[in-house]
């Protein structure tokens, strides 16, 4: 009986086993879809070697998936195969049966390793995140444990940013940009230190650089030797976006020792030259003539773009110092100097022409031209020429006497010449008292200045004098400190508050302070109230740009005071004090333009000064 049933029992066991195996295989295939798909793809391989290699890859994939399940890790998007990555940029899709080579799963990394590894992985991750891009950001710890691929829109942003940087870089001179950045950092540090004890009490986040102050370190040397130097100031718009309207203007400084010559040259820029110290013989060379002028401190002259000129310092003892406002004509804010002669510092621009062009132009053999103009004789190697060291050279007293014979002095009787030098002190000062004087020539009075739309000023102040608070209606003023020291305060509107005007936030003013000394430059934007306090005997020059119809408006003093011209009815609405209080306050200052910075304190005067003007004037105290 048992023997008869045994085959049936055995058959049932086999049946149950086969069913279990089938269910197990089905379950395993469900849990291991990648391995199953990989095996099916191997069946299409007819070559035995490739078939075995394919099964080996599938087994490796199986082991990795089992390890992941054992470790309890959440499956991550697998790195993209290089071919698939190219498909994302529009290439033809590959056959589904062709499987990518498995990549090892990324292990958790320390935070300092993430940044280094990020660049290696950013082009290898699969684009699965694109399908789930709406999810919020994870915590930092999760990001460190489970690195995620960059989102596509981030890649696009990075790509556009990189392209933008490349285009920007191609349009700039990298050396000058790096120098500007270094100088900005240095100037930031200096301006923060100059704030003094008052600024040290402010929170650090409120300490910002003074974008209007350019100290002598902001100059870049173009030529220099033992006889002098030529320097150019950093571009205004590179210092601050607030100075964008000065992007077409540059400041040049020339300094030379006695008995020296600045070699003949021209520039692709209009020059407005002012003699700060010393004397000069400046000669303009034209096609059929030349004009030589004896210049001294306070003299000014326009040198049109493309005009060849040279400068001699004829004095035996005093250095010559000139300041120049340059207005480039080819490229905004950029200009070049073209020297006729070759020196060790630069080549003659004539050397840029071809040999046959020079021979035809001078109807002379090139060897003779090379010897006469460029100092190179036949057989000499480069570097053996008889050349001057730089563009500033020594000149003998005999040569100076010969050059002085035909030089004319600048006119002190007229300031309206179209092409001759003029002196800033040739007329009476427009503001003057025992504490200071201001001389000024405007475009309306001089054709040379009218063409450039610039006014010129020179100011002399005694130690302890205060140039009263005022603002210019249109002109942007560039101060050049020639001698002495001063403290300057400039008032503007805080940029942060400007951005909040639409939100009806109250406007706040910001005070820009600077300690100025010799060779410093300070820019005063139009409409910004400013005050200058001379801490020693002071002399400075000023270029007023966009000067036509400019008006200087004073905020204190007995004359030309804007506040005193406001009707009493409006004054009472504008200020907390009564019209009578405001009138008494204005009249308490008997001087105008230049006053004593430390007047004798009067008890009654102090009471009157403490409350009435809750306005922009408070920024000066």
Curated annotation (Swiss-Prot):
It comes from the Eukaryota. Keywords: Allergen, Disulfide bond, Endoplasmic reticulum, Glycoprotein, Seed storage protein, Signal, Storage protein, Vacuole. Residues 612-621 are annotated as: Necessary for sorting to protein storage vacuole. It is found in: Vacuole, Aleurone grain; Endoplasmic reticulum; Protein storage vacuole. Residues 25-62 form a propeptide. Glycans are attached at residues 277, 533. Residues 174-196 have a biased composition (Acidic residues). InterPro entries: Cupin_1, RmlC-like_jellyroll, RmlC_Cupin_sf, Seed_Storage-Functional. It holds the Pfam family Cupin_1. Its main location: other. Residues 80-92, 111-173 have a biased composition (Basic and acidic residues). The alpha-, alpha'-, and beta-subunits associate in various combinations to form trimeric proteins. Seed storage protein. Accumulates during seed development and is hydrolyzed after germination to provide a carbon and nitrogen source for the developing seedling. This is Beta-conglycinin alpha' subunit. It comes from Glycine max (Soybean). The gene is CG-1.
């Amino acid at each position: 009986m048992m023997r008869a049933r045994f085959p049936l029992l055995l058959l049932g066991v086999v049946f149950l086993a086969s069913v279990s195996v089938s269910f197990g295989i089905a379950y395993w295939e469900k849990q291991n879809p990648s391995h199953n798909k990989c095996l099916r793809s191997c069946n299409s391989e007819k070559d035995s070697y490739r078939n075995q290699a394919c099964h080996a890859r599938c087994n490796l994939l199986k082991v990795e998936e089992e390890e992941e399940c054992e470790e309890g890790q959440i499956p991550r998007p697998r790195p993209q195969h290089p071919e698939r990555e190219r498909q994302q940029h529009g290439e033809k899709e590959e056959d589904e049966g062709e499987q990518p080579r498995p990549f090892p799963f990324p292990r958790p990394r320390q935070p300092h390793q993430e940044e280094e590894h990020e660049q290696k992985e950013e082009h290898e991750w699969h684009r699965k995140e694109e399908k789930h891009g709406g999810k919020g950001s994870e915590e930092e710890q999760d990001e460190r444990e489970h690195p995620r691929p960059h989102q596509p829109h981030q890649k696009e942003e990075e790509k556009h940013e990189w392209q933008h940087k490349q285009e920007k870089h191609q349009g700039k001179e990298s050396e000058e940009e790096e120098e500007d950045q270094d100088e900005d950092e240095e100037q930031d540090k200096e301006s923060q230190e100059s704030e003094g004890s008052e600024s040290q009490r402010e929170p650090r986040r409120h300490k910002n650089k003074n974008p209007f102050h350019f100290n002598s370190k902001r100059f870049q040397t173009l030529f220099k030797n033992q006889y002098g130097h030529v320097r150019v100031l950093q571009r205004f718009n590179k210092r601050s976006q607030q100075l964008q309207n000065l992007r077409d203007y540059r400041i040049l400084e020339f300094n030379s020792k006695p008995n020296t010559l600045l070699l003949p040259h021209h520039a692709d820029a209009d020059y407005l030259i002012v003699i700060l110290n010393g004397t000069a013989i400046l000669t303009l060379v034209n096609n059929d003539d030349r004009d030589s002028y004896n210049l001294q401190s306070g003299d000014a002259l326009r040198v049109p773009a493309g005009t060849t000129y040279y400068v001699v310092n004829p004095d035996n003892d005093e250095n010559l110092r000139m300041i120049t406002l340059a207005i480039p004509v080819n490229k905004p804010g950029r200009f070049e100097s073209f020297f006729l002669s070759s020196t060790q510092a630069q080549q003659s621009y004539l050397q840029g022409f071809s040999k046959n062009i020079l021979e035809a132009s001078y109807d002379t053999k090139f060897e003779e031209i090379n010897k006469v103009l460029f100092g190179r004789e036949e057989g000499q190697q480069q570097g053996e020429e008889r050349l001057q060291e730089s563009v500033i050279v020594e000149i003998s007293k005999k040569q100076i006497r010969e050059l002085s014979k035909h030089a004319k002095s600048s006119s002190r009787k007229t300031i309206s010449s179209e092409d001759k030098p003029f002196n800033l002190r040739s007329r009476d000062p427009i503001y003057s008292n025992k504490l200071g004087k201001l001389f000024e020539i405007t475009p309306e009075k001089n054709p040379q200045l009218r063409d450039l739309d610039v006014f010129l000023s020179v100011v002399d102040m005694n130690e302890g004098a205060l140039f009263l608070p005022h603002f210019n209606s249109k002109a942007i003023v560039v101060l050049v400190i020639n001698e002495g020291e001063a403290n300057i305060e400039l008032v503007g509107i805080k940029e942060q508050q400007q951005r909040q005007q639409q939100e009806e936030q109250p406007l706040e003013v910001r005070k820009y302070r600077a300690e100025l000394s010799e060779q410093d430059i300070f820019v005063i934007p139009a409409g910004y109230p400013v005050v200058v306090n001379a801490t020693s005997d002071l002399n400075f020059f000023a270029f007023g740009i966009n000067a036509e119809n400019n008006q200087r408006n004073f905020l204190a003093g007995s004359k030309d005071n804007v506040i005193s011209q406001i009707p009493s009815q409006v004054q009472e609405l504008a200020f907390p004090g009564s019209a009578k209080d405001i009138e008494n306050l204005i009249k308490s200052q008997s001087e105008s333009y230049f006053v004593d910075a430390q007047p004798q304190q009067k008890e009654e005067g102090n009471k009157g000064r403490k409350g009435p003007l809750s306005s922009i004037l408070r920024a000066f105290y």
